[in-house]
A protein has these predicted regions:
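An acidic/histidine-cluster motif and surrounding catalytic segment
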Residues: 1-92, 96-128
Length: 128
């Protein structure tokens, strides 16, 4: 059984200098037969460049690292949405590991069928 059948396109965040993490996540994609993925350069809104883009956010509310992730993810979502490439998108970071998929008692299509009819966004994981 291919538990990831029906998986939407994936966009993953990766800093330009973290080629090790790029290799890790693309190795995961290869292992699981995932071919529809796009790398998003998280260096665009890196903390090192916060003086260039930090004025767009209230940095009193966010740590620079969190602000960087927010800006990269929002910009990525906007670009994806405006492209019309697909109805759904899976956004991940480059340190994700799919190893637990083999233990799922369900598959991706079951997840999609189980969502409420009017869902707009689903967060599967949060690391604090």
């Amino acid at each position: 059984m291919n538990k990831l059948k029906g998986l939407p396109p994936i966009m993953y965040l990766n800093l330009d200098h973290r080629t090790d993490r790029k290799e890790h996540i693309e190795g995961q994609f290869k292992k699981w037969g995932i071919t529809d993925f796009t790398r998003w350069s998280a260096s665009r809104f890196s903390t090192k460049k916060i003086d260039e883009w930090g004025h767009k956010l209230d940095l009193m509310l966010l740590a620079p690292s969190d602000a960087s992730i927010v800006m990269n993810e929002f910009t990525m979502m906007i670009e994806w949405y405006e492209s019309g490439i697909s109805e759904n998108l899976l956004i991940i970071q480059d340190d994700l590991c799919f190893d637990l998929v083999e233990y799922w008692p369900f598959d991706w299509e079951t997840i999609m069928k189980s969502l409420p009819y009017n869902w707009e966004i689903v967060q599967f994981y949060h690391c604090h």
